[in-house]
Amino acid sequence: MAASFSGPSMIMEEEGRFEAEVAEVQAWWNSERFKLTRRPYTARDVVALRGNLKQSYASNELAKKLWRTLKTHQANGTASRTFGALDPVQVTMMAKHLDSIYVSGWQCSSTHTTTNEPGPDLADYPYDTVPNKVEHLFFAQQYHDRKQREARMSMSREERARTPYVDYLKPIIADGDTGFGGTTATVKLCKLFVERGAAGVHIEDQSSVTKKCGHMAGKVLVAISEHINRLVAARLQFDVMGVETLLVARTDAEAANLIQSNVDTRDHQFILGVTNPNLRGKSLATLLATGMANGKTGAELQATEDNWLAMAQLKTFPECVMDAIKNMNAGEDEKRRRMNEWMNHTSYDKCLSYEQGREIADRMGLKNLFWDWDLPRTREGFYRFKGSVMAAVVRGRAFAPHADIIWMETAKPDFAECTAFAEGVKSMHPEIMLAYNLSPSFNWDASGMTDEQMRDFIPRIARLGFCWQFITLGGFHADALVIDTFAKDYARRGMLAYVERIQREERKNGVDTLAHQKWSGANYYDRYLKTVQGGISSTAAMGKGVTEEQFKETWTRPGAMEMGSAGSEVVAKARM
């Protein structure tokens, strides 16, 4: 309970409690769980942000479980594989086969926003949308766990031994998009996720204003330092709440073509500039503004931009220098020597600033290179960016001390890219865990892989360190496929379509929704009714007359299309 601190002795008690809690937090940080984590703040800062009333969160137990699961996979060179869950039906079916659950912002944006207004993945839905979906699924997990316990404790030991146990409490990793704004927005979002049941949260390095699905065009990155601030804000909130929620840092740098600012020198080597001196003083933004003032619209403005970019000869500054060396009036040996000198000073992992690169170029005699990164800025003020795996590696290395897992969003399922990213990040952070999006946005059949290579893709990149792998929209696509094909067949064949495609398949595969009243917990709440009323209730939902009794016995239907040896088919079996 919170105490009142007024007199001198109470003041000392207040300080004593504070210092004890600071020591407790410091000991927690010194544990194996956080040995790789860097914090730019102190335990004292964290405790000062806490209230006097200590709270605990169920999601913290699942965060610890997720950590153990992923570290085990990492040690074994395997992966936790999962996909985006849409609803309680999916999350309970997944629990029987998978060891983690994903909640996708794309799926929420298209199917379950808090305003009920669907749309594409632009992160323009209310920021409690994904936390609310997490709570929806987390409540379902807990409910089915309670329901199973009641059912099992109503069985004999022999019955329990014959009955498979399902761990419904699989940890949830949720989509935190870009953190939904500034530091305070990220802090409040992460607080919601912990309260609603998330064991892990991922945050990406796109601009929150222009955020898009990772497989759309027009992605705008924020500076490395800005995204680190987001990660620090998330970690601080987790520390204040005393939880071990896993933090996943995602980078979209592999395919991004714009960046919000050039404030971070680590980004400089990937920013594009104009190398055509004929465009000196003729910025693209000014040209477009003039065109609009003169009445140009749409296609005309696009043509103006396309023509300007074609003339601009955009390059990064390192590319500009290397091209200048190649075009020097010197022998091949001298060019090779200059190129080696440049590369030795400016390899991408050194992350030299533009100013440092310009100084080195000047020393090499390349003093009059024309290169301007302001001229090609967009109408919105964004810089042009050359996305690549190298850019993602630089960001992954920078994010690793502040996150538990690093994820590079990619444009295609490319093993060589996965290898380059894993080796690049792990060369500096060998113990960091990696994640991979097995995206349905990829046309896997056009990837050039054989069926065997597709089957082996997950274990193959798992050996590189990608210990958490997921199909973001797996639930969405599975739902659409089943409903579309069933609706079409049902419109044509009526109840036979339902019986053949759904009911018999549920029975054949042991899907527990066959007995949907029991799946929904009717027996569980009958137990409540009977407990309240002394062990008997005339209004129990699963009492005499419930139609689900039809599924308890085994009988045969003569003349079935798929006949057994006796010319009949088993169409129902007793299920517990």
Curated annotation (Swiss-Prot):
Q: What is its main location?
A: other
Keyword Cytoplasm among UniProt keywords: no
Localisation = Glyoxysome
Its cofactor is:
Mg(2+)
Catalysed reactions listed for this entry: D-threo-isocitrate = glyoxylate + succinate
What is one cellular component GO term in this UniProt entry? glyoxysome
**Which family does the record claim for this protein?**
Belongs to the isocitrate lyase/PEP mutase superfamily. Isocitrate lyase family.
Give the multimer and partner information: Homotetramer.
Protein name per UniProt: Isocitrate lyase
From which source organism is this entry? Ricinus communis
What does UniProt list as this organism's lineage? Answer: Eukaryota, Viridiplantae, Streptophyta, Embryophyta, Tracheophyta
